[in-house]
Amino acid sequence: MRILSMLSALALASVAAPGRAQPLKITTSIETFASLARSIGGSNVQVESLSRGYQDPHFVEAKPNLVVVLSQADLLVYAGLDLEIGWLPPLVQNSRNARIQSGASGNLNASTAIDVLDVPSAKVDRGQSDIHPRGNPHYWIPPVNALKVAKEIAERLKQIDPSHASAYDANLQAFGAELKAKVPGWTAKAAALKGLKVVTYHKSWTYVSRWLGLEEVGYVEDKPGIPPDPRHLAELIERMKAQGVKVLLIENYYNRSIAQLVTDKSGARLLVMPSDVGATALTKSYVELVDEVVGKLAAAS
């Protein structure tokens, strides 16, 4: 953190520089939001993600160079719901960029547009696990949610850069039309998935399960972010056998050894899934990400 503080002077110099050049600079916490921002901003924006699609968004290393990136941002887009709580807030603070501080027009918590799932009914202690007290933050894959985030990005861009408002509206309309054209194909491909019983490593596929009609039977992690104990795994394996679970979903950034043990003993198939743009060479955009997610699930059903 000392290094972050040392870079604050450079960050401040960047913020204070007059005559800010176009295009507008958008910084995002994950690659999916970067893809959405490029779709909406077009040639009027320059977009950079603070994390890569193959990284766990809960645990991104707060490297000093990210302070400089944030110091130059006109708009920051992040998932919220405490997904980035372990690394993003100190970077934003040390950037000394008034444009992206909490409450500023350049600070966009994308979760405010989402119908949030898994909101705990009782008070939770984050010290015991990676439970999110405000609800599940892994919401960006279903098209309805991606479009909501895209609309929020468009609105913020119009506030920050009203001279290009018509371009942002046109780009949003084009993105919405692209999704409208793709959804019937995704829905048809996923028709056989309705009622499919699955287990997931982390409780991060809830929104996808709700969208595609999957039934989540259990989770390898008994408590989010905490390695499971043998008793939980034994109970999970027996439940999978009893209910005929054939698929276990895991993101490509998790260690697969425990999940592989569960599938070996239960007879299920381990399906390594991309959960963010850039997770694989086949997921270079939001649409490609959904293509890959739906395609892999359909092939495994």
Give the residues covered by each predicted segment:
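Bacterial N-terminal signal peptides that target proteins for export
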Residues: M1-L7
